[in-house]
Amino acid sequence: MKFILSVLALASFQHVFCDDVERAYAWRNISFVDTREGTYNPEDVIPTGVTHDAKTKKLYFGVPRLYPNIPYTLAEIDTNKYNSSEIRSPPFSKFNSQGGKEFTSIYQPVIDDCRRLWVLDVGEADYKKNGNEYPTKNPEIIAFDLNQEGNPEVHRYKLEGDVAKTPLGFGGFAVDVLNPNGNCATSDETYLYITNFIDNALIVYDMKNRNAWKINDDSFKPEPGKSVFNHKGEEYTYSVGIFGITLGDRDKDGHRLAYYLAGSSTKVYNVNTANLKKKVKSLKPTLLGERGYKTEAIALAYDPKTKVIFFAESDSRQVSCWNIQKDLKPENVGVIYTNAYFVFGTDIMVDADSTLWFMSNAHPPTKIPKLEFDKRQIRLMKVPTHRAIRNLPCEMRKA
């Protein structure tokens, strides 16, 4: 009887809480279009970031050069060509852009309100390399216009000095367009907020004035102790600072609340972007509360339609939600998805159609570079946000 109950419990754990969550794609090993077999090791292809363009139905992936011979570090998939019910593991194609320079290593792509695709090329491969395969250079912020044919490059800025000191510590970033309802084609009233989990810092980039600066705060630091990642009975520890950041709604002056968390913490903070833009010496963030035991996450995403923030958690094999109109405490946090094979949530985003996309890659920031798995370990899921939160604490029900 105990054995039967254990099997039933495991089966329950392997299923989603929300019936509307769909598996978009899953990979054990990722291949590349127009790239000859044997020139790279498919096991070394580990995407860390993803974004979806709702207009073209294309997915864009950051594939950092964690190992040698990665064909390209910014990839795409046209979901119109690959029906997820028929093709579970489509190959990656090289990002299509006119006149763009080659990248060194990209972790995350982000699409802003003007349909510009932003990437941060950290300028350095994350392994000990021989020779000059990928020359080390300064990190660069780059934007491409998805509204134009060929996705031309429309902006590039090289980070220098103190803000570029530890490029392999860059985590997630958010793009803040001040007036997306205006003329986006000429809009340069844009800021980027880039986390650095090694320096426990936030890098602010002012596109109009082409200037970047660093902000430090105690709230950016990891909690005391180590985060633990469990796999096949073994425990792996890590400790990282501020990693995920997302932006709330605009006020009448165009400012927003930036919500952020450290990768080794269950606390969530926010700060008004007006303070970030002013280069203030004292940040004075607000501690919103804690999400609960073992709920560490490195990625979060805000949905303006439902007023909900979603979290891709690190060790719990789940995705959770919290409505910003409620106090942040464990009883107000809901779980929209849990699956034993959703191993280490690496990125999460809400597209222009209010569809939530979240990805796991089984690659935590531990000293063990690659873990062995029996099942496909890279999984990309999707669900409409309003369906994801039904009957959960993060849903605001009408009286």
Curated annotation (Swiss-Prot):
A cellular-component GO term for this protein: extracellular region
Residue spans crossing the bilayer: none
Tissues/organs with expression: Salivary gland (at protein level).
Positions bearing carbohydrate: N29, N83
Location of the protein in the cell: Secreted
Keywords: Glycoprotein, Secreted, Signal
Chief location of this protein within or outside the cell: secreted
Signal peptide range in chain numbering: 1-18
Function: Probably modulates blood feeding of sand flies on vertebrate species by binding and sequestering different mediators involved in the host response. Functions as a chemoattractant for host neutrophils; likely acts through a G-protein-coupled receptor and effect is dependent on calcium influx and phosphatidylinositol 3-kinases (PI3K) activity.
Note: Exacerbates Leishmania infection in mice when co-injected with parasites and yellow-related salivary protein M35.
PANTHER family, sorted: PROTEIN YELLOW-LIKE PROTEIN (PTHR10009:SF18), PROTEIN YELLOW-RELATED (PTHR10009)
Family designation: Belongs to the major royal jelly protein family.
Protein name, UniProt field: Yellow-related salivary protein M10
Lineage: Eukaryota, Metazoa, Ecdysozoa, Arthropoda, Hexapoda
